[in-house]
Amino acid sequence: MSLREQMGADTLIAEYTPPDVIQKFMTGGDVGHDKDGSVLRIEPWGYLDMKGIMYSCKKSDLEKSKLLQCEKHLKDLEAQSEKVGKPCTGLTVVFDMENVGSKHMWKPGLDMYLYLVQVLEDNYPEMMKRLFVINAPTLFPVLYKLVKPLLSEDMKNKIFVLGGDYKDTLLEYIDAEELPAYLGGTKSEGDEKCSELICHGGEVPKEFYLENTDDFETMETITVGSGDKIYVEYEIENENTYIKWEYKTEEHDIGFGLFRKNGDEWEEVVPIERTDCSIMTLDGSHKCKDPGTYALCFDNSFSMMTSKNVRYTAEVMDPEVDSEDINKMIKDSTWDELSAQIS
């Protein structure tokens, strides 16, 4: 199952609102269209505080926000195609590296940003049309060496690094009235940087950090010894019950998966994935189609020298009641009967 299906991308526009920290500090914005009608997006990456954002939200929120962005692009392209009377496809990105410094070489942040690019590639393979890099800093060769192994060949072929005359080049592909004034066009929404359309990021205040909430205080804590695994069991009594989880290590990485007991053996349901989750909380859920004994597995078998302290929480949720069942309850039940049915 693709991430797009897992996250219910078809309903994100109607049902999902990103956390405040993503809305206020995740750089970028759509400003119009290029000459072919493709969506034009500006990414002022140099002003992105990826560490602050990763400290302030869950990985699933970053994934959902990227999918939401792509779903909005599809809607935009559909409307633009109808407006101009021809098919409009793809995304043109101006990737502005002004203000990029050593903080942007923080490996977890780079990995996460590139992972989100990979989310776009994997789930919307034809979305990215071209990416113009402008204001490349002196450390660009170092950054490129770091990210090159993580980019697909297809993505590499869509990247164009422009020199000091980038404004002239951009205007070959983008009409002036569609390009923000600070990039050589004439568009001004709020100011020459089109701040009403583009989030220009900035340092994330520490009050946004999840560590400042009480969530971590309510989590269970376990220590997974070096070379060891720990199974945390839950009894699932009904079909189609959901189990949800969140976890985070104090340091280092940990393997995590979901298993179901089959006789005396544990059967893998969600494959174990080894991830460094010391930076941000990882979360997920699974619909248990069959009753039985399920277990969250925290796997440290790959580490023969280091124990891992893990904080986690899990919740077992009753099977979904679909809208047809709800309508039947309301139609055929009194208020007291309805309360009894859903309690």
From Swiss-Prot:
Protein keywords: Acetylation, Sensory transduction, Transport, Vision
Domain annotation GOLD: ranges: 206-316
CRAL-TRIO domain segment(s): 18-191
UniProt entry tagged with the keyword Metal-binding: no
Tissue specificity statement from the Swiss-Prot or TrEMBL entry: Outer and inner segments of photoreceptor cells.
Gene3D superfamilies: CRAL-TRIO lipid binding domain, GOLD domain
Pfam families per the UniProt record, alphabetical: CRAL_TRIO, GOLD_2
SUPFAM superfamilies xref list: CRAL/TRIO domain, Supernatant protein factor (SPF), C-terminal domain
UniProt function note: Shuttles 11-cis- and all-trans-retinals between rhodopsin and retinochrome and regenerates the photoproducts of both pigments. Also binds weakly to retinol.
Record protein name field: Retinal-binding protein
